[in-house]
Amino acid sequence: MDDPIIQRIERFRCSRGALFAERRNRGYTLYRSQSAAPVARLRPAGPADSFEVLYWSLWKNRWASTGPFGRTVVSIDDALRFIAYEDIFWVMT
């Protein structure tokens, strides 16, 4: 598959470990390569390169918004940096 978003995700150098992604249900699910544990979910939002960033909520048992006041919508590059540095994404890994 030649999905440019998946290629960008898999090329991203994350200090916590390599990521791989798959396209699922109108978005992308990111996994840690070492454990295959889910790390984050990116859902397209608005302009071509904007994504809502979601994390797996152990309390709600579903993907949830990361922002304190609602959705976090950023470019793919900003989303990957956000995921790399925020601990909430790495709880299950």
Walk through the language-model features, giving the residues of each:
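Mixed-charge, Lys/Arg-enriched low-complexity segments
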Residues: 1-9, 55-93
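Negatively charged, low-complexity tracts enriched in Asp/Glu with abundant Ser/Thr
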Residues: 1-35
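Generic structural motif recognizing short loop/turn segments at the entrances and edges of beta-strands
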Residues: 17-19, 26, 49-51, 85-88
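Short, conserved beta-strand/beta-arch hydrophobic-aromatic motifs that form part
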Residues: 32-55
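Intrinsically disordered, low-complexity regions
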Residues: 18, 28, 47, 68-71
